[in-house]
Amino acid sequence: MRSLVGDLVLVRLQEERDPLLHKRLYNALRRAILDGSLAPQSRLPPSRDLAGELGVSRNTILTTYEQLLAEGYVVSRRGSGTFVAQTAPESSLTAKEERENNSLAAPTAHLSRRGQHLLGQVSASPRQWGAFIPGVPDVNAFPHPLFSKIQARISRRPKPERLSYSCNGGTPELQQALVDYLRVSRGVHCQSDQILITEGIHQAIDLVTRMLCDNGDLAWVEEPSYWGIRHVLAMNDVRAEPLTVDANGLCPPETVDDAPRLIFVTPSHQYPLGAVMSLERRQRLLALARQQGSWIVEDDYDSEFRFSGQPIPALQGLVADAPVVYIGTFSKTLYPGLRLGYVVIPRPLVSDLKHAHAELYRGGHSLIQMALAEFITAGHYSAHIRRMRLLYSRRRAFLTELIQRHCMPYALSDFSDNAGLHLILNLPAEADDVAIAREANARHILVRPLSRYYLTAAHKKGLLMGFASQPEEQMASAFSVLLGCLQTHCPQMLLLREDAEKQNAPT
């Protein structure tokens, strides 16, 4: 006849999935102790008896008991046996306590108002891979074997200092590689000590905002703009003033009543609308920044991916000693999970920003930085970008053709400049782009609503559609699903079947 503990363990064993029997047994007993099914001070059967009840070897039971004993879940009393400990070693709540507490308090009950505000504004999606996701490259096209080979060789005998924290803003190899690359490809003028390696654009924006702004300071942002900028500003109690964007980029005001401390711009390819800032606007913005004592933060977004014409040189290199903090990332050219970006720091700020970065973030990833430096200097990086430019150009043309075949002529963005990794599908003013995106996301179509990129209520409606990450056949299949969402929410923007057939008929 089995004991109560034996019956309990048999039931719990059926719920465990580990291939190793002793681990399934350990997990079953541990879970029973934590949720109160095995009460404190209750006696466990002798190892020989429990082995017989369960039909397993005694060694399996002994191994399990020893593990529970070592971790403090049970205690052994000489001559008396093995007992459940009075207090489980877990510092977290038991499942029962957790359920009771969750019924009494909201998840954000102990967050600061700032933290609650941040979570209330969350825009990052838990899904970061799929059809039409904006800003994500084709990570499968990255030369992983080549990069892994470089990494393996560098990691074979690393110097000890390469395995510690980095307090110099990155490895000298990557800093110099970026100086040379940015000078040739983007017209950026700097020396290697002005390069600071970060863990992406977000960290760069946070560092610059923390170090250059006080509470209540003003920052200009493009309208619409990258939501991450607005969130970082809000978290640092910096006011964000949206400035209109037209076909020539950000529109600086004629007069300035309240001087901004920072001016955030994406002049080479405005995010998300795609406009290129004209030379006249760039010169006006530089003059205004000097006059007002402001710093321009230039996010050189998608500058590598122009599919016609010549790349637009960076704002940073337009004049000597420009009041520009230039930031970039490898997320779009290589892959987002690399988590490497960079800042070109103006000379007067170099020492302070590097020291602040070391204190706030404790930089690292030195071996990956060295591998990336070799990848760049050996010419692999430029070659990869050239290959991707051709691939993305074809995919952009394919998505453009899909939209033109099925949607009204106004569906493609006015500001499209044949660059970047996404298109904007314009929607009628009365459409609810958030609802459309929500329904599409539920069907694993990862479009983003354009209205969410605006700070004010006067916003356009549309969908950001990335074309880089997925091949043409997957885009075609996903577009059919998206058409179903559009048919439900705004059928007026779709061409009738006979109109579509006429438009696509050979002439």
Regions found by a protein language model. Name each.
Residues 1-154, 348, 354, 358-365, ...:
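N-terminal basic, amphipathic alpha-helical segments
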Residues 221, 242, 298, 372, ...:
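Hydrophobic residues in well-ordered beta-strands that form the structural core
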Residues 319-352:
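Active-site PLP attachment segment
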Residues 137, 267-271, 332:
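Short glycine-rich anion-binding loops that position phosphate/pyrophosphate groups of nucleotides
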Residues 151-292, 304-305, 310-321, 325, ...:
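Conserved core of the PLP fold type I
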Residues 453-457:
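AMP-binding (ANL) adenylation modules
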Residues 342, 370-378:
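Helix-loop "lid/cap" segments that line or gate small-molecule binding pockets
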